[in-house]
Amino acid sequence: MRPAALLLLPSLLALLAHGLSSEAPITGEGHATGIRETDGELTAAPTPEQSDRGVHFVTTAPTLKLLNHHPLLEEFLQEGLEREEAPQPALPFQPDSPTHFTPSPLPRLTNQDNRPVFTSPTPAVAAAPTQPHSREKPWNLESKPPELSITSSLPPGPSMAVPTLLPEDRPSTTPPSQAWTPTQEGPGDMDRPWVPEVMSKTTGLGVEGTIATSTASGDDEETTTTIITTTVTTVQPPGPCSWNFSGPEGSLDSPTAPSSPSDVGLDCFYYISVYPGYGVEIKVENISLQEGETITVEGLGGPDPLPLANQSFLLRGQVIRSPTHQAALRFQSLPLPAGPGTFHFRYQAYLLSCHFPRRPAYGDVTVTSLHPGGSAHFHCATGYQLKGARFLTCLNATQPFWDSQEPVCIAACGGVIRNATTGRIVSPGFPGNYSNNLTCHWLLEAPESQRLHLHFEKVSLAEDDDRLIIRNGNNVEAPPVYDSYEVEYLPIEGLLSSGRHFFVEFSTDSSGAAAGMALRYEAFQQGHCYEPFVKYGNFSSSAPSYPVGTTVEFSCDPGYTLEQGSIIIECVDLHDPQWNETEPACRAVCSGEITDSAGVVLSPNWPEPYGRGQDCIWGVHVEEDKRIMLDIRVLRIGSGDVLTFYDGDDLTARVLGQYSGPRGHFKLFTSMADVTIQFQSDPGTSALGYQQGFVIHFFEVPRNDTCPELPEIPNGWKNPSQPELVHGTVVTYQCYPGYQVVGSSILMCQWDLSWSEDLPSCQRVTSCHDPGDVEHSRRLISSPKFPVGATVQYVCDQGFVLTGSAILTCHDRQAGSPKWSDRAPKCLLEQFKPCHGLSAPENGARSPEKRLHPAGATIHFSCAPGYVLKGQASIKCVPGHPSHWSDPPPICRAASLDGFYNGRSLDVAKAPAASSALDAAHLAAAIFLPLVAMVLLVGGVYLYFSRFQGKSPLQLPRTHPRPYNRITVESAFDNPTYETGSLSFAGDERI
């Protein structure tokens, strides 16, 4: 028995080990046998008890890198970088970027149309979809494909999914009888998200193992364990074609058609998730779908999916934006041969923003930025106080939001205002009605050595016991300067304090209500007048501090008329400075004639309520060749009140429109240059509410003989040749720097009142202009359209030197069109040094005789008679650095007489054509120059004898005697010799 027990001991230990592993008890270190810890998260391997659990979501994409993230995101980004730099666990697969579709916790997309998100996992797919491109760099994980050992034969079926186990999860002992069997439903939770493996159409699935037999003999039992190797070959149907994207930008490409025909089309999902605080922008680069194919785009991350677009609205160049950081695209194609269609989308993350904060009533808001980190600053109008946060900050989230609610501006009931310079006091609820049972006290205190002036903007109290008291002091005991109980009319000039203080009391009873009061205060120095004020108007002054002698001129806002005062007032009286006239008032009056080209018509007493039983008429007149556009911006009148517009200058003209009761914004156009407006209020009732009435803006516009108004174009502007778009008007469109006009930039208004061309657009310039050719060169271009990054290289012809940059590169600019890196070069004639002149050979000559000869010049040599030229008769200055002569200079050698003549004849016969003309010239000069000299000598001798000796040396003897002429006494004779009567000769004294 003892040997038998020893033989059974290994089998019992193996069974015990398998039982412990199947129950997965937690060890002392906190790890279960079937659980592996990865990056701080526990992920469980599939077990039979967990086969129906959802797949655990684990992303394998690297941490999102945002190129231009907000500073508030640095914490999250740094955390992501640290997680990225941490050593990654060795995984049993190598994902691409983006990976094939993995189950994702994105809401509302796990099940659509009651169909599974992806088909049953199979180890074979009919066709591998085209892998989209992304900027994310895939992880380089290397791991040996695991081997799977199973303990039972595989069940029959068309396909199956085989889980991949980690090496440490492989059973090292004989598996128990309850081994996990692959099923059609696919694995449950695993160490990583399950990814369908892409295989060929016909796949041989081999599960290899070793056959081992262990036998234990005993009295009553025998155990045998066998490992079987099985190979299954299956033909798979089309599988899923879906991906997850988590980068800041990437591409979505349509899947390729299956390699074999199928009765089922593709059903593909593309899930995009970017960093929270960013939205997803998808641009349609190209799309071509078959009839019946569908594409839907939805925004995710909210309580419900947000439909964004479908195949009916997806056109090339269209941009779709998801207001959340997640988006999904679903593509359903037709089976072959009809489908699938093709598409190519690009997506990128864009920064989301907070909504523009609501402007408080009786206040305003200024915003630095609507993006996370931006702030909004609220402030109230004079007389109102801010209730709530003055500053709001936009916080980053899936949908950015303000850190607090928008504040409101309220009119406080009482308060102390110290160092009061200029401001307002309004009753609670103003300009609406105040409430009952109020008791409000305000104390106004001016700066040192200054006084206060109070101006009554409005006082409207109920006729019961409501009361307003203003005291000339700082407490309730000070003497009153105004009491609504005792004064029926308001002081137009206002109130002046004798010191630094005013004390204001406002009280209401339990019944009745009205608009209340609005008081304006201003402090002024001793020896100066107070700052004047006109409601619904403006003024200009000659001095900012209003000393004595200051003049002030008033004007009213459009629609108001100056009343009850002078347009110009002056500060007078040095001892007690004061204005010589009270400030005027600007009011919206009933009726009037207006001849301006643009203006405003207001209901009587606007924005205060108009009176009952009024009948007002306004006449508006513009130039004769124009018409009037009426822009009715506010129309809130009673149902018994009537507002009528007449297309002419009296009440007999055609009625343009007649209105009663409230109405929204609308416009009217007249056909003439005049319009008459009539307002009749119901005598029985009156409007008591604030801003009850109407506001009408009018403008002078051209008649109906004009072309339609042309709109502005994005990234550009228009410039018409004249304001009226009549026939012949030319409108020129231009684009901002960095953009160019696409289409005709010049449009003309034609006879039929239509424009000659379609509206152009401004398109971003993505290429440089042609830099042009350079004379005496050729160029090499990298792209014929010269896009950004293109280069142009210039190469000069032989004999020319390039000046400038030989290579030009097209660079992009943020504030303008792309520009070349440099100007186009020039090819200049290459300059060479001259050759030094050569001396003439002995007994010879050279031509020309110069000290320096330019490159390319030629020297000719010749010898004297009786000498023979040995060498080249002509040599050339060869260009170079330095330049040099083509041959050495020749020499002249003496020759015999016979040889001279023979050699000379031979030389002349062999003389090159280029030197024969020169030698002939030399020969002619040698012959004719002596001849010319001899002729000149003979001519000179002849002239000498003919003029100075009185006879010609060439005179010949005559054949007959010359005639004799007697000399008469009367003839003139001036010979001195004959006058003296003597003739002397050399050597004789007397004859």
Curated annotation (Swiss-Prot):
Residue ranges annotated for the Sushi domain, each copy included: 352-411, 527-588, 705-764, 766-829, 833-894
GO biological processes: adult locomotory behavior; cerebellar Purkinje cell layer development; excitatory postsynaptic potential; negative regulation of dendrite development; positive regulation of dendrite development; regulation of dendrite development; synapse maturation
Keywords of this entry: Cell membrane, Cell projection, Cytoplasm, Disulfide bond, Glycoprotein, Membrane, Repeat, Secreted, Signal, Sushi, Synapse, Transmembrane, Transmembrane helix
Residue stretches making up the CUB domain: 241-353, 413-524, 590-701
Name of the protein in question: Seizure protein 6
UniProt entry tagged with the keyword Cell cycle: no
Segments of skewed composition (Polar residues): 175-184
Post-translation changes: Glycosylated.
Record-stated family: Belongs to the SEZ6 family.
Pfam families: CUB, Sushi
Glycosylated position list: N286, N396, N433, N538
GO cellular component: apical dendrite; dendritic shaft; dendritic spine; endoplasmic reticulum; extracellular region; extracellular space; neuronal cell body; perinuclear region of cytoplasm
Composition bias, Low complexity: 119-132
InterPro entries per UniProt: CUB_dom, SEZ6_CSMD_C4BPB_Regulators, Sperma_CUB_dom_sf, Sushi/SCR/CCP_sf, Sushi_SCR_CCP_dom
Signal peptide location: 1-19
Effect of deleting the gene: Mice show reduced exploratory behavior and motor coordination, altered maze performance, and poorer memory retention. Molecular, morphological, and electrophysiological evidence of defects in dendritic arbor patterning was also seen. Secreted and membrane-bound isoforms in null mutants exerted opposite actions. The secreted isoform showed an increased neurite number, while, the membrane-bound isoform displayed a decrease in dendritic arborization. Embryos were viable, fertile and normal in other respects.
Cystine connections: C241-C268, C354-C394, C380-C409, C413-C440, C529-C571, C556-C586, C590-C616, C707-C749, C735-C762, C768-C810, C796-C827, C835-C877, C863-C892
Extracellular-facing ranges: 20-922
Transmembrane segments: 923-943
Role noted for this protein: May play a role in cell-cell recognition and in neuronal membrane signaling. Seems to be important for the achievement of the necessary balance between dendrite elongation and branching during the elaboration of a complex dendritic arbor. Involved in the development of appropriate excitatory synaptic connectivity.
Tissues expressing the protein: Brain-specific. Expressed in extrasynaptic and synaptic subcellular fractions (at protein level). Expression correlates with the most active periods of cortical neurogenesis and neuronal maturation. Expression is restricted to the gray matter with higher levels in the forebrain including the olfactory bulb, anterior olfactory nuclei, olfactory tubercle, striatum, hippocampal CA1 pyramidal cell layer and cerebral cortex. Expression is up-regulated with the convulsant drug, pentylenetetrazole.
SUPFAM superfamilies noted in UniProt: Complement control module/SCR domain, Spermadhesin, CUB domain
